[in-house]
Amino acid sequence: MPTTSTDPRAAAATLLVPGTTCHGFAVERRETVPELDSDAYVLRHTASGARLLYLACDDENKAFAIGFKTPPADSTGVFHILEHSVLCGSAKFPVKEPFVDLIKSSMQTFLNAMTYPDKTIYPVATTNEQDLYNLMDVYLDAVFNPAIYTKPTIFEQEGWHYELDLPESAEGEGDGSSASLREGTLRYNGVVFNEMKGALSDPMSVLDDAVNAALYPDTAYAHESGGDPRAIPALTYEQFLDTHARHYNPSNSYITLYGDLDVDRALAFLDERYLSQPSATSRRMDAAVAAGEDPSALAPNPLGVQAPVTCEYKRIEMATTPENALVGLGLVLGSALDRKRTIAADILFEALLGSNEAPVKKAILAAGLGGNVVSYTAAECLQPYELIMLQNAQPGVARELRRVFQDACRDLCEHGVPRERLEAIISSNEYDLRQRDYGIADGVAIACDALSTWLYDDDAATLALKIGRASCRER
């Protein structure tokens, strides 16, 4: 039933009562998320299987996102190519570049798409509600009814194709003779192919890929989800279409709505325009493993158990100068669903490595193994990990880096990490949480955060939103 309240939280509370159904969506539960000054509603579309999370709050910068579980089976970059390709026209919007047209004509405050190691997300944000529906319409038609099935050139343009480079003399003649063609050089070209050539020319990206392959053998994380230029040309058009058909369907989707919006209208729009259409309900997957529902596709061992490391030391040669040499040390932190543990580990590593005076970083630099140490926590996967990188590394220091790191950690286990340092880091994180300065539209950042746990457990849609860094004071 329509609501008349101008308070989005009150309107949602009246409309979305757990145990009831609204526009084909079963309302499974309601939770308060005080960290975001919002109420969260978890719903499931009965006919299509689509999951939906609505965060009711008074933010006028409304957001919508649809994501899909997309664990790669190889490094052809098929999901990255799909991310580009579905935004090159659709059944309802048969224009060459609807994405570019939206940037020019919309009141959007965010408009993009992102490929992660195990998911692909299409988020938008705007302060105008009608504009939000326009954006939703374009994005939903793009992901469910893309033009890729009738226009193979989209795959060739965004993925890869052959291109013939002719000598300057032959180009000038332009006669297209067989002699001129024989003098040409055949090469690969394509938007994603070239993008990944650039990305993987960075030694840090190559090192990160190698560490992932070592930490997570026989899983989706062992592959480069963006695509390895050496593997991209192995992808066929037929495989590309089959991958879209198996993964880009409502039963494998995660939809987020956020902000001060008419949720009754939004749910009706989703149900009537897309999720209850025959094409949507008939595409419910029988083989759940195709969308990565089988945990073994993402993690080799039960959650909470570190993945076996089959590659302790690996050397990769690149055409780069010696001063760019890197050594990496990767540490699996557990499960993304153990949110407190992951955040506590992030805070701990900041205390150990976050500055030149941090004890572990100081010990590594004092050992003269390299010029600098950088580290980060990678939380966008089922088993988060910490990657410690030694820059300007001296030859043959991999084993020594591990020894120095372990010795420094043993010393800290015996004597402890200075409490005042941990307090300072937690206080800084608490301030950042209060400020909520994500650098992008809040609703978009929150949709991405939610998927960092929701993707792996339907009951964890709000876990990443409710357990913040501040809760680590309890530990």
Locate predicted features.
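N- or domain-start disorder-to-order transition segments that initiate the globular core
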Residues: P2-D59
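Charge-rich, well-structured scaffold segments of protease-associated domains
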Residues: P2-H23, P71, S85-P302, E317-D338, ...
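Short acidic-hydrophobic surface loop/beta-edge motif
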Residues: D39-T46, A307-T320
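Short, conserved beta-strand segments within well-ordered enzyme catalytic domains
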Residues: L53-L55, A65-G67, P123
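Short, conserved catalytic-motif segment at the N-terminal edge
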Residues: E60-F64
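Short pre-active-site segment immediately N-terminal to the catalytic Zn-binding motif
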Residues: G67-G77
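Active-site recognition of the HExxH zinc-binding catalytic motif
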Residues: T76-C88
